[in-house]
UniProtKB/Swiss-Prot annotation:
Assembly and binders: F-type ATPases have 2 components, F(1) - the catalytic core - and F(0) - the membrane proton channel. F(1) has five subunits: alpha(3), beta(3), gamma(1), delta(1), epsilon(1). F(0) has three main subunits: a(1), b(2) and c(10-14). The alpha and beta chains form an alternating ring which encloses part of the gamma chain. F(1) is attached to F(0) by a central stalk formed by the gamma and epsilon chains, while a peripheral stalk is formed by the delta and b chains.
Site description Reversibly protonated during proton transport, residues in chain: 70
Record's protein name: ATP synthase subunit c
Gene Ontology CC terms, in alphabetical order: plasma membrane; proton-transporting ATP synthase complex; proton-transporting two-sector ATPase complex, proton-transporting domain
Cited function: F(1)F(0) ATP synthase produces ATP from ADP in the presence of a proton or sodium gradient. F-type ATPases consist of two structural domains, F(1) containing the extramembraneous catalytic core and F(0) containing the membrane proton channel, linked together by a central stalk and a peripheral stalk. During catalysis, ATP synthesis in the catalytic domain of F(1) is coupled via a rotary mechanism of the central stalk subunits to proton translocation. Key component of the F(0) channel; it plays a direct role in translocation across the membrane. A homomeric c-ring of between 10-14 subunits forms the central stalk rotor element with the F(1) delta and epsilon subunits.
InterPro entries for the chain: ATP_synth_csu_bac/chlpt, ATP_synth_F0_csu, ATP_synth_F0_csu_DDCD_BS, ATPase_proteolipid_c-like_dom, F/V-ATP_Csub_sf
Matches recorded under Pfam families: ATP-synt_C
Keyword Secreted carried by entry: no
Transmembrane segment boundaries: 13-33, 63-83
Subcellular location: Cell membrane
Species lineage: Bacteria, Bacillati, Mycoplasmatota, Mollicutes, Acholeplasmatales
Source organism (scientific name): Acholeplasma laidlawii (strain PG-8A)
PROSITE patterns registered for this protein in UniProt: ATPASE_C
Its membrane topology: Multi-pass membrane protein
Amino acid sequence: MNTFFQIMTQTEFFATGLAYLGAGISILAAGLAGIGQGLAAARAVEAVGRQPEASGKITVTMILGQAMVETSGIYALIIAFILSSK
């Protein structure tokens, strides 16, 4: 079994395949980050609908949360671009 892994790690084809697999997983993570942002925005709109007087506080909190989620999505896309260029 060790011989199999030694041969596979030495081939360029196997390394390229793993790089593309990692890029695909990164794209999946970026897509899930987008879904999370949409859900957060939907909940913020519901909260403003229930308490319009707190809209400023809700909006600021939502924007900070969106920024934190967006950074992970951007990092995932950068990783995907790096891995797919190898």
